[in-house]
């Protein structure tokens, strides 16, 4: 068994540690990779719920310990799938068309659940639907608009909560159940909207938002979102007003990055005021004080989560029960050990300001999907993995969502085929699942 070698270096004034060797694990051959693996068990998400083996940022852990994943079935429908970590069984929790009474096909279909699933204090799970893509020149259908939906795991009941904005999909839903408020972001035009849960009368409340913007609700009950100019918009429900603060780096510069590179992914800490932010096209982790006063708020750089070329992090940012911030970043594989890309898991410790690269995520049960059989059958959309020189199966193109469960288990979604990967290495107790 080989020893792990920790190489420490400083990024943005913070200590970063990379683990560059590995112990013996399943899947290794005679060759030794120059990095450690983080092993996960893969589960093929119900194939009848997708068309192109894909889903997006939509994943959460319910209060019952089960995992809920949104899927995309272009031109047809979308679904919320429930995964039970104990039985390892899956089932459909939401059939969007059935719940909302939708009948559209092609571009008119409710083809994606793309929202980051929001779990209310009641345990109810809030999601939204949006359009997919046109398939061919004959698809001239108009998209009617997306719906907000809620699923109650206790009652096993889903409800439609209306269409916030005709002809626009829903890219984010957050619920302040204490104040009976729903926050919604639309797409492809990013309107920031609000409604009372009791009457579902949606209205715009503030400036236009950045692409794929999400709402964080702080400890004071205020909603926060990133504007189109990459500033901080804060809605105070007591005053029914929005305040915008400029987001600046410590040297006074704007954090604005144009286009998809700047897409923000952020989470809020248990203190109800600290937000951690990671953008799609870079690997720098920032913290923001959502309760800061004044005309601007400082985005403090905490360091580089994963060092490498062409960083790409999707919805893979989460906080574990240990208080650590976990992230996955895809980088170009420049190690000489295989080609393509590597999806690296890292974590940040707020107490020590230390970043640790934990390793490349890898699949320990390579037989979870029969790639050769699918290829022989002419199946498309199965190109999302590659095999490294030691025989290890690892993601190639796209990771999407990541959540940390209450027991410390990490769950990651991967495209092509659409996969749920369960990482047990950081679990602190038995699987946390209730009936």
Question: Where are the regions that the model predicts?
Answer:
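Repeated scaffold domains used in trafficking and secretory/extracellular systems
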Residues: 53-58, 101-117, 167-174, 208-220, ...
């Amino acid at each position: 068994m080989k020893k792990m070698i920790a190489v420490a270096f400083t990024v943005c004034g913070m200590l970063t540690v990379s683990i560059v060797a590995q112990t013996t694990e399943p899947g290794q051959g005679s060759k030794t990779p120059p990095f450690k693996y983080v092993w996960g068990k893969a589960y093929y998400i119900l194939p009848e719920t997708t068309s192109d083996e894909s889903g997006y940022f939509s994943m959460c852990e319910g209060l019952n310990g089960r995992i809920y994943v949104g899927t995309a079935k272009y031109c047809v429908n979308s679904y919320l799938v429930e995964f039970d970590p104990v039985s390892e069984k899956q089932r459909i929790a939401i059939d969007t068309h059935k719940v909302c009474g939708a009948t559209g096909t092609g571009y008119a279909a409710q083809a994606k659940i793309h929202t980051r699933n929001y779990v209310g204090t009641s345990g109810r799970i809030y999601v939204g639907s949006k359009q997919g893509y046109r398939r061919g020149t004959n698809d001239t259908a108009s998209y009617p608009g997306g719906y907000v939906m809620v699923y109650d795991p206790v009652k096993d009941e889903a409800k439609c909560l209306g269409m916030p904005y005709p002809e626009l999909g829903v890219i984010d839903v957050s619920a302040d159940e204490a104040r009976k408020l729903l926050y919604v972001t639309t797409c492809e035009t990013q309107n920031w909207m609000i409604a009372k849960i009791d009457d579902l009368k949606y209205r715009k409340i503030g400036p236009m938002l950045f692409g794929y913007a999400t709402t964080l609700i702080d400890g004071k009950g205020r909603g926060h979102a990133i504007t189109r100019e990459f500033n901080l918009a804060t809605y105070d429900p007591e005053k029914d007003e929005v305040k915008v603060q400029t987001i600046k780096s410590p040297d006074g510069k704007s954090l604005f990055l144009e286009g998809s590179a700047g897409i923000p992914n952020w989470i809020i800490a248990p203190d109800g005021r600290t937000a951690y932010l990671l953008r799609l096209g870079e690997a720098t982790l920032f913290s923001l004080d959502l309760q800061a006063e004044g005309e601007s708020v400082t985005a403090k750089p905490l360091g580089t989560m994963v060092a490498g070329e062409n960083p790409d992090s999707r919805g893979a940012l989460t906080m574990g029960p240990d208080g650590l911030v976990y992230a996955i970043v895809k980088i170009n594989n420049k190690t000489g050990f295989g080609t393509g890309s590597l999806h690296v898991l890292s974590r940040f410790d707020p107490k020590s300001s230390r970043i640790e690269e934990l390793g490349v995520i890898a699949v320990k049960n390579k037989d979870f999907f029969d790639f050769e059989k699918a290829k022989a059958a002419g199946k498309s959309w199965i190109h999302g993995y590659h095999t490294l020189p030691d025989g290890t199966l690892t993601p190639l193109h796209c990771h999407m969502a990541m959540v940390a469960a209450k027991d410390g288990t990490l769950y990651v979604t991967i495209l092509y085929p659409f996969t749920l990967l369960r990482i047990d290495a950081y679990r602190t107790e038995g699987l946390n699942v209730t009936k």
